[in-house]
Amino acid sequence: MTPRPHVTVKWAQTLDGRAAAADGSSQWITGADARGDVHRRRAEADAILVGTGTLLADDPALTARAETGGLLVPADEQPVPVVVGHRDIPENAQIGEHPALAPHGLSAPLQYSGDDLVAMLADLHSLGYQRLFVAGGPSVASALLAARVVDEVLIYLAPSLLGGPRTALGDIGIASMSEIAHLKIVHTAQLGADLLIKAAIDPAAPTRSTLTSHPIQEGTSCSQD
């Protein structure tokens, strides 16, 4: 097996599985308690990843922040920002000023095309990143799940309904029930009105060769930053 970081994928969704309204708006699906939990978990990661679709749509800061708005952990302990996708990072993007860049000797966020996710993760591992937190969006989460390179998911479930086409996940490479991905729920928590479900993915699950490289289809979505 190719060495890679431990990969945690996070998303927020409504009860009917939507990550955004039909017009693309998504702030906020979950409440303050759930968002605070996300930031505490970000602080435990070495790197934080977002797709260019979400980057361009939301301009997320990708920092681990306290309720007051300040940094939850010092700059040198903040997760290093990683961007995946072919589109350029805008010059005025917030992550260009990410506090973790200078302490880690970086002048800009790390960026990968997303054409080979296994190779991307191997490179991150070689750079010393052991824990990767995936902040969004649905295209990135779906591609990583399809490539079978995710260790656990954090699903923040809001007691609300949106309907429409903007689902939390897209195609994850499963065509029939015989290929269903079984997860093990390892933790649940009530966070205000919302529910956190933490589930681990069975490392023994079969990996289809057609899924070892699953390019990301770039779209627009929310990181719930």
Show which residues each predicted segment covers:
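Conserved histidine-centered catalytic loops in small-molecule metabolism enzymes
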Residues: 117-118, 172-225
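Preference for bulky hydrophobic residues occupying beta-strand positions
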Residues: 9-11, 155, 199
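Structural signal for conserved beta-strand scaffold positions within catalytic alpha/beta enzyme cores
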Residues: 83, 111-113, 155, 187-190
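Active-site ligand-binding patch in enzyme domains
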Residues: 2-133, 139-142
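Flexible, gly/pro- and Lys/Arg-enriched active-site loops
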Residues: 147-183
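Generic C-terminus detector
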Residues: 124-133, 142-150, 159-164, 196-199, ...
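Intrinsic-disorder/low-complexity, polar/charged segments enriched in Ser/Thr/Lys/Arg/Asp/Glu/Gln
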Residues: 6, 152, 194-196
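Short, loop-centered acidic/histidine patches that primarily coordinate divalent metals
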Residues: 137, 156-159, 191
